[in-house]
From Swiss-Prot:
GO terms for molecular function: tryptophan synthase activity. InterPro entries: Aldolase_TIM, RibuloseP-bd_barrel, Trp_synthase_suA. It comes from Rhodopirellula baltica (strain DSM 10527 / NCIMB 13988 / SH1). The active site is at E49, D60. This is Tryptophan synthase alpha chain. Keywords: Amino-acid biosynthesis, Aromatic amino acid biosynthesis, Lyase, Tryptophan biosynthesis. One of its GO terms (cellular component) is cytosol. Pathway: Amino-acid biosynthesis; L-tryptophan biosynthesis; L-tryptophan from chorismate: step 5/5. One of its GO terms (biological process) is L-tryptophan biosynthetic process. The alpha subunit is responsible for the aldol cleavage of indoleglycerol phosphate to indole and glyceraldehyde 3-phosphate. The keyword Nucleotide-binding does not apply. It comes from the Bacteria. Its EC number is 4.2.1.20. Belongs to the TrpA family.
Length: 278
C-alpha cells in the first residue's frame, strides 16, 4: 500500500476530507517553501503538492505562472525539488505528511521515466501529478510507477469524454485530480452547476479517491466542494497569499519567511474548519 492509499483509507475511516495545499518550489526560496508547508501541516493539511517550476506551464493561471517565473528567475533547478524533499523528510513537523510533485511530462521524459521516479522517491515524494500527460502516452509511465510503488495522478476535466475518463482512471493511482472548471488554475467565486453530477458519475466508475482542484478561492468554495470530494487541492489562493506576505514583510522590515508561514497557516486553518464543518 502506498502512502497515498494509506492516507485516504485512514481519512475515509474518520469521515474526513483531505486538504492539499499547492506550493511552488523555491518561490521565493526553499526556506520559505519549507516553512509554509510546515505551517500548512500544523494548520490541518493532510498532504501537499509541490510544484516543479517550468517555463511553459500548461494549465496554470497568472498567479502560479508568476510564481514559477519568480522561482526560475531566482535560479531554480530540479535539484531544489529533491533538496526540499530531503528537508521535509528531516523536518519533524512534516516528515509524516505525504507529498507529491506537480511536474510537466516534458521534464519526466527528458530525465527518463524510471530515473525521475527513483529520484523523487529517494527525496521522499510518493507520487506525481502530471497535468500534460496524454492518456495515449500514459501506459509506460503508469507501469513504471506501479512497479515502484509510486502513484501517478492524472487530471480529469469537465470536457474529458467519458471513455477517456475511464481510461485515465485505469492508468492512475493514489487519487484522481478532478478539475472543477474549464480553463486554467485560479480563484473563482462561482462553480459549475454540473460539477456534482460529473463527479458522481466518475465515482461510479472507479474506486480511486477523487480530489477537486482549480477555482477554490477560500473557505466558502471549500465548504461547497467538500461533501462532493475526497479532498480539496488549493493552489492559487495560497500562492497569492504567500507572495503578498513576502512583499509586505520586505516593505515593513519583518521576517518574510515567518510572515509567509503565518499567513499560509492562518488561511489553511480557515479552510480546514470550513471543510470539517461542511
Amino acid at each position: 500500500m502506498t502512502p497515498l492509499q494509506s492516507l485516504f483509507e485512514s481519512l475515509r475511516g474518520q469521515n474526513r476530507k483531505a486538504l492539499m495545499p499547492f506550493l511552488t518550489t523555491g518561490d521565493p526560496n526553499i526556506d520559505t517553501t519549507e516553512a509554509v508547508i510546515a505551517a500548512a501541516r500544523q494548520a490541518g493539511a493532510d498532504l501537499c503538492e509541490v510544484g516543479v517550476p517550468y517555463s511553459d506551464p500548461i494549465a496554470d493561471g497568472p498567479v502560479i505562472q508568476a510564481s514559477y517565473q519568480r522561482a526560475l528567475d531566482a535560479g531554480f533547478k530540479l535539484q531544489h525539488v529533491w533538496d526540499l524533499g530531503q528537508r521535509l523528510t528531516e523536518n519533524p513537523k512534516v516528515k509524516a505528511m505525504p507529498r507529491v510533485t506537480m511536474v510537466s511530462y516534458s521534464i519526466i521524459y527528458r530525465i527518463g521515466m524510471a530515473k525521475y521516479v527513483d529520484q523523487a522517491m529517494q527525496a521522499g515524494y510518493c507520487g506525481a501529478i502530471v497535468p500534460d500527460l496524454l492518456v495515449e502516452e500514459a501506459e509506460d509511465l503508469s507501469k513504471i510507477c506501479r512497479e515502484k510503488g509510486f502513484d501517478l495522478i492524472q487530471l480529469v476535466t469537465p470536457t474529458t469524454t467519458r471513455d477517456r475518463q475511464c481510461r485515465i482512471a485505469e492508468l492512475s493511482s493514489g487519487f484522481l485530480y478532478y478539475v472543477s472548471v474549464t480553463g486554467i488554475t485560479g480563484e473563482r467565486t462561482a462553480l459549475p452547476t454540473n460539477l456534482v453530477d460529473n463527479v458522481g458519475w466518475l465515482r461510479e466508475q472507479t474506486e480511486l479517491p477523487i480530489c477537486i482542484g482549480f477555482g477554490i478561492s477560500g473557505p466558502e468554495t471549500a465548504a461547497q466542494l467538500a461533501p462532493v470530494s475526497d479532498g480539496l487541492i488549493v493552489g492559487s489562493a495560497i500562492v497569492r497569499r504567500v507572495a503578498d506576505a513576502v512583499e509586505k514583510a520586505k516593505s515593513s522590515g519583518a521576517d518574510p519567511v515567518k510572515t509567509a508561514a503565518e499567513e499560509a497557516g492562518d488561511f489553511c486553518h480557515s479552510l480546514r474548519q470550513a471543510i470539517d464543518a461542511a
